[in-house]
A protein has these predicted regions:
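Phosphate-binding glycine-rich loop
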Residues: 75-117, 125-126, 130, 134-135
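N-terminal "arm"/small-domain region of PLP-dependent enzymes with the aminotransferase-like
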Residues: 2-81
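Conserved active-site segment immediately N-terminal to the catalytic lysine
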Residues: 204-247, 267-269
Length: 390
């Protein structure tokens, strides 16, 4: 791998995860009911910035009654919409990416990776770590992609790109180099691209699609199926699994819809594990329309860029520390993170205290919410916490 490989943005490197499952569950964002009860503030009075979900949701029309009455069917229209959106032929709808995160370790153990070591970003979405460790895998932390030149044969590498919560984004060219090295060692690269939609030019989905199409063309030309080769990991596409989320960019977290992009053999194994009727009829209906509404997607990118830039300006003015993130969240590392989190909660503003407890992640608010956040950050209690340490 290129030793001079660099990040588009710089990741954080702090450690220290929550000590108990109860604490870890509490640390997840999106638990507004719990916060309302804890601070005795009604839910309607909170400004919830605890998630990385877009503040503008894709507009959902009235759903046909058949969506509710019939069992979910194989939906070719949804598949075609996903193939066009992600620019790859092999896609599998899932009830959110979390379901695949939880089942991936078991699937990998049946496909020649039972004794593999798993490389995980030291700072990142902790559900990945929970799943692999629960399945008994040995995990190794890394802080920078350059450290991955130490991987051994059959190792599994988990890349969160862009990273949640640091916002670190590796370029597609650099990830392609990493894939080459992992493939040469018969390993597996899993990329969580849940926050990739607004920076889709850096996604590996199109590269995966190119490789999968090449395999299909080769199979047709030789009249020999390539599926028998998958177990031996002879094609680079079989060394790559990509997880995508519909909930974040489209503001549809409650729909519970995601996609896995991978080779046919990986998708077959995951489909079997998911079982029948995995994705609800309403989710299929909404997902198909959201993925094909290209004009709305373009407008969403523009709006998110504007709102996220405005948030970054407010945070930069309030904090002495640099602000990093994506168009769906901004993160600030500060030693006062727990105290600032508590002070904001007392004012009915719910942000994400990161697992290492040395950073705060802010979801993107509307203009009115941003004004409330800005005003709160300028109050005396917050100003005392935000002053740089002398």
């Amino acid at each position: 791998m290129d030793k001079n490989m660099t990040l588009i943005t710089t990741p954080s490197t702090q450690t220290s995860a929550p000590n108990t499952l109860q604490e870890q569950a509490l640390m997840h964002g999106g638990q507004l009911s719990n916060m309302a009860q804890r601070y005795q503030i009604e839910e309607k009075d909170w400004l919830d910035l605890s998630t990385g979900i877009a503040p503008i949701a894709y507009p959902v029309s009235i759903l046909p009654s058949a969506c509710w009455q019939r069992l979910p069917q194989h939906n070719e229209r949804l598949l075609q919409a996903a193939r066009r959106y992600y620019q790859t032929p092999n896609v599998l709808p899932t009830p959110g990416s979390q379901s695949i995160i939880q089942m991936l370790p078991q699937i990998c153990s049946t496909r020649g990776f039972a004794r593999s070591k798993v490389w995980l970003p030291k700072v990142g979405y902790q559900e990945h770590r929970k799943a692999w460790q629960k399945a008994g895998y040995q995990t190794i932390d890394y802080t920078d992609i350059n450290e991955l030149d130490q991987i051994k044969p059959k190792d599994i590498v988990l890349l969160i790109n862009p990273n949640n919560p640091t916002g670190a984004l590796y370029s597609k060219e650099h990830v392609c180099q990493l894939l080459e090295e992992i493939h040469s060692k018969q390993g597996l690269l899993i990329i969580d691209e849940a926050f990739m939609d607004a920076t889709g030019q850096q996604s590996m989905a199109q590269e995966l699609g190119r490789r999968n199409r090449a395999i299909s063309n080769r199979a047709l030309s030789t009249e020999t199926s390539s599926s028998s080769d998958y177990g031996h990991n002879t094609d680079k596409s079989d060394a790559l699994i990509i997880l995508r989320s519909v909930g974040k960019f489209f503001g549809l977290a409650g729909v519970r819809l995601g996609f896995v992009l991978a080779s046919e053999s990986w998708l077959s194994a995951m489909s079997s594990s998911l079982g029948p009727w995995a994705v609800s009829g309403p989710a299929q209906f909404v997902g198909e329309r959201a993925l094909t509404d290209y004009r709305w997607q373009e407008e969403q990118c523009i709006v998110l860029t504007r709102l996220s830039s405005a948030l970054e300006t407010v945070l930069t003015q309030a904090f002495a520390q640099p602000v990093h993130g994506t168009s769906l969240f901004k993160t600030v590392r500060t030693p006062q993170a727990p105290a600032i989190f508590e002070a904001l909660c007392q004012q009915g503003i719910y942000v994400r205290l990161c697992d290492e407890k040395d950073a705060l992640r802010f979801g993107i608010p509307h203009e009115q919410g941003l004004k409330r956040l800005e005003d709160t950050l300028h109050t005396a209690p917050l100003q005392q916490l935000l002053l740089p340490c002398s």
